[in-house]
Protein backbone atom coordinates (compact mmCIF):
# COMPACT_ATOMS: atom_id res chain seq x y z
CA UNK A 1 0.00 0.00 0.00
CA UNK A 2 1.35 3.38 -1.03
CA UNK A 3 -0.09 6.82 -0.48
CA UNK A 4 1.11 10.14 -1.79
CA UNK A 5 1.35 13.13 0.50
CA UNK A 6 3.12 16.45 0.74
CA UNK A 7 6.08 16.30 3.11
CA UNK A 8 9.19 18.28 3.81
CA UNK A 9 12.92 17.85 4.28
CA UNK A 10 15.03 19.81 6.71
CA UNK A 11 18.08 21.86 5.76
CA UNK A 12 20.55 21.92 8.65
CA UNK A 13 23.14 24.69 8.66
CA UNK A 14 26.05 25.10 11.07
CA UNK A 15 28.90 27.62 11.11
CA UNK A 16 32.51 27.95 12.08
CA UNK A 17 32.45 31.74 12.14
CA UNK A 18 35.18 33.56 10.21
CA UNK A 19 37.38 36.03 12.04
CA UNK A 20 38.48 38.65 9.50
CA UNK A 21 35.91 38.34 6.69
CA UNK A 22 32.94 36.44 8.16
CA UNK A 23 30.63 37.55 5.33
CA UNK A 24 32.77 35.47 2.94
CA UNK A 25 31.77 31.82 3.17
CA UNK A 26 33.12 28.45 2.07
CA UNK A 27 30.48 25.69 2.10
CA UNK A 28 30.74 22.01 2.92
CA UNK A 29 27.74 20.09 1.50
CA UNK A 30 26.64 16.60 2.53
CA UNK A 31 23.21 15.28 1.60
CA UNK A 32 21.32 13.72 4.48
CA UNK A 33 18.31 11.87 3.08
CA UNK A 34 19.88 8.57 1.99
CA UNK A 35 19.93 5.81 4.60
CA UNK A 36 23.33 4.23 3.95
CA UNK A 37 26.30 4.43 6.29
CA UNK A 38 28.64 5.51 3.50
CA UNK A 39 25.94 7.12 1.35
CA UNK A 40 25.65 9.41 3.09
CA UNK A 41 25.76 9.22 6.90
CA UNK A 42 29.52 9.46 6.39
CA UNK A 43 29.32 12.92 4.81
CA UNK A 44 27.01 14.25 7.53
CA UNK A 45 29.24 12.76 10.25
CA UNK A 46 32.35 14.34 8.72
CA UNK A 47 30.64 17.75 8.73
CA UNK A 48 29.85 17.41 12.43
CA UNK A 49 33.32 16.17 13.30
CA UNK A 50 35.07 18.88 11.29
CA UNK A 51 33.07 21.59 13.05
CA UNK A 52 33.72 20.03 16.47
CA UNK A 53 37.47 19.69 15.89
CA UNK A 54 37.89 23.19 14.46
CA UNK A 55 35.93 24.90 17.24
CA UNK A 56 37.81 22.84 19.85
CA UNK A 57 41.22 23.80 18.45
CA UNK A 58 40.16 27.46 18.27
CA UNK A 59 38.87 27.40 21.87
CA UNK A 60 42.14 25.80 23.06
CA UNK A 61 44.19 28.48 21.28
CA UNK A 62 45.91 25.92 19.03
CA UNK A 63 44.75 27.52 15.78
CA UNK A 64 43.34 30.91 14.83
CA UNK A 65 39.76 31.33 13.77
CA UNK A 66 39.59 30.97 9.96
CA UNK A 67 39.56 34.19 8.00
CA UNK A 68 36.31 33.26 6.27
CA UNK A 69 33.22 31.50 7.59
CA UNK A 70 32.87 27.76 6.97
CA UNK A 71 29.20 26.80 6.56
CA UNK A 72 28.25 23.12 6.88
CA UNK A 73 24.98 22.26 5.12
CA UNK A 74 23.08 18.99 5.29
CA UNK A 75 19.92 18.65 3.21
CA UNK A 76 17.99 16.48 0.80
CA UNK A 77 20.26 15.67 -2.13
CA UNK A 78 20.26 18.44 -4.72
CA UNK A 79 16.79 19.86 -4.07
CA UNK A 80 17.42 20.89 -0.47
CA UNK A 81 20.60 22.78 -1.34
CA UNK A 82 19.13 24.48 -4.40
CA UNK A 83 16.05 25.59 -2.47
CA UNK A 84 18.30 26.98 0.27
CA UNK A 85 20.45 28.89 -2.25
CA UNK A 86 17.41 30.28 -4.04
CA UNK A 87 15.41 31.36 -0.97
CA UNK A 88 17.76 32.25 1.90
CA UNK A 89 18.80 35.89 1.65
CA UNK A 90 22.54 36.61 1.89
CA UNK A 91 24.93 39.35 0.84
CA UNK A 92 26.73 37.10 -1.65
CA UNK A 93 27.07 33.51 -2.75
CA UNK A 94 29.86 31.41 -1.22
CA UNK A 95 33.37 31.71 -2.60
CA UNK A 96 33.72 27.94 -3.00
CA UNK A 97 32.45 24.65 -1.64
CA UNK A 98 33.07 20.94 -1.49
CA UNK A 99 30.61 18.05 -1.76
CA UNK A 100 31.21 15.21 0.74
CA UNK A 101 29.37 12.19 -0.60
CA UNK A 102 30.17 8.58 0.31
CA UNK A 103 33.38 8.79 2.32
CA UNK A 104 35.33 6.64 4.75
CA UNK A 105 35.09 3.32 2.94
CA UNK A 106 37.70 0.82 4.06
CA UNK A 107 40.44 0.59 1.43
CA UNK A 108 39.34 -3.00 0.76
CA UNK A 109 35.83 -1.75 -0.09
CA UNK A 110 36.91 1.03 -2.50
CA UNK A 111 40.18 -0.52 -3.77
CA UNK A 112 42.03 2.20 -1.87
CA UNK A 113 40.61 4.95 -4.09
CA UNK A 114 40.08 8.40 -2.60
CA UNK A 115 38.49 10.29 -5.47
CA UNK A 116 38.59 14.05 -6.05
CA UNK A 117 36.26 15.02 -8.91
CA UNK A 118 36.54 18.45 -10.50
CA UNK A 119 33.96 21.16 -10.18
CA UNK A 120 31.68 21.86 -13.15
CA UNK A 121 33.92 23.09 -16.03
CA UNK A 122 32.50 26.62 -16.29
CA UNK A 123 33.28 27.44 -12.63
CA UNK A 124 36.58 28.46 -11.04
CA UNK A 125 38.93 25.52 -11.61
CA UNK A 126 41.59 26.75 -9.17
CA UNK A 127 39.54 25.10 -6.41
CA UNK A 128 40.22 21.70 -7.99
CA UNK A 129 43.98 22.25 -7.81
CA UNK A 130 43.95 23.64 -4.26
CA UNK A 131 41.89 20.67 -3.07
CA UNK A 132 44.16 18.18 -4.83
CA UNK A 133 47.24 19.77 -3.24
CA UNK A 134 45.67 19.69 0.24
CA UNK A 135 44.61 16.05 -0.13
CA UNK A 136 48.07 14.97 -1.35
CA UNK A 137 49.69 16.79 1.58
CA UNK A 138 47.27 15.16 4.05
CA UNK A 139 47.88 11.67 2.65
CA UNK A 140 51.63 12.28 2.94
CA UNK A 141 51.21 12.94 6.69
CA UNK A 142 49.06 9.93 7.47
CA UNK A 143 47.52 7.44 5.10
CA UNK A 144 45.43 4.40 6.08
CA UNK A 145 45.75 2.90 2.59
CA UNK A 146 44.36 5.34 0.04
CA UNK A 147 45.67 6.63 -3.28
CA UNK A 148 44.29 9.92 -4.55
CA UNK A 149 42.57 9.68 -7.93
CA UNK A 150 41.50 12.86 -9.68
CA UNK A 151 38.96 13.03 -12.44
CA UNK A 152 36.71 15.31 -14.45
CA UNK A 153 33.39 16.71 -13.29
CA UNK A 154 30.61 14.19 -12.64
CA UNK A 155 27.04 15.50 -12.26
CA UNK A 156 25.99 13.92 -8.95
CA UNK A 157 23.14 16.36 -8.28
CA UNK A 158 24.91 18.09 -5.38
CA UNK A 159 27.93 18.95 -7.51
CA UNK A 160 25.61 20.93 -9.79
CA UNK A 161 25.86 23.65 -7.12
CA UNK A 162 28.87 24.73 -9.19
CA UNK A 163 26.58 25.80 -12.03
CA UNK A 164 26.91 29.56 -12.72
CA UNK A 165 23.23 29.95 -11.77
CA UNK A 166 24.46 29.51 -8.20
CA UNK A 167 27.95 30.72 -8.87
CA UNK A 168 30.50 28.79 -6.82
CA UNK A 169 32.90 25.94 -7.59
CA UNK A 170 32.07 22.70 -5.79
CA UNK A 171 34.31 19.63 -6.36
CA UNK A 172 33.34 16.20 -5.02
CA UNK A 173 35.38 14.14 -2.53
CA UNK A 174 34.43 10.46 -2.28
CA UNK A 175 35.36 6.82 -1.78
CA UNK A 176 32.41 5.89 -4.02
CA UNK A 177 34.47 4.37 -6.83
CA UNK A 178 36.45 1.16 -7.12
CA UNK A 179 38.97 0.29 -9.82
CA UNK A 180 35.98 -1.04 -11.77
CA UNK A 181 32.63 0.59 -11.07
CA UNK A 182 31.35 1.63 -7.65
CA UNK A 183 31.41 0.03 -4.20
CA UNK A 184 29.37 -3.18 -3.99
CA UNK A 185 26.74 -1.98 -1.52
CA UNK A 186 25.83 1.19 -3.44
CA UNK A 187 22.17 2.12 -2.84
CA UNK A 188 21.43 -1.11 -0.99
CA UNK A 189 20.84 -2.36 2.55
CA UNK A 190 24.43 -3.63 2.47
CA UNK A 191 25.71 -0.06 2.96
CA UNK A 192 26.42 -0.53 6.67
CA UNK A 193 28.88 0.89 9.20
CA UNK A 194 31.13 -2.18 9.12
CA UNK A 195 32.25 -1.10 5.62
CA UNK A 196 33.63 2.18 7.02
CA UNK A 197 37.20 2.69 8.22
CA UNK A 198 37.40 2.90 12.02
CA UNK A 199 38.92 6.15 13.38
CA UNK A 200 41.13 4.21 15.84
Show which residues each predicted segment covers.
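Metal-dependent peptidase/peptidase-like ectodomains
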Residues: 1, 75-176, 181-182, 194-195
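Glycine- and acidic
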Residues: 27-36, 112-117, 189-194
Amino acid sequence: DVREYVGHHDVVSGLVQGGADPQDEVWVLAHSAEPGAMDNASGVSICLEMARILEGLIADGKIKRPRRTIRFLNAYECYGFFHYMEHVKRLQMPLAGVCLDTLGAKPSVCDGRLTWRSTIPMSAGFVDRIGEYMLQATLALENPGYTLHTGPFVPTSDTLAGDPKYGFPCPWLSTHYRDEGVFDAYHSSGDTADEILSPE
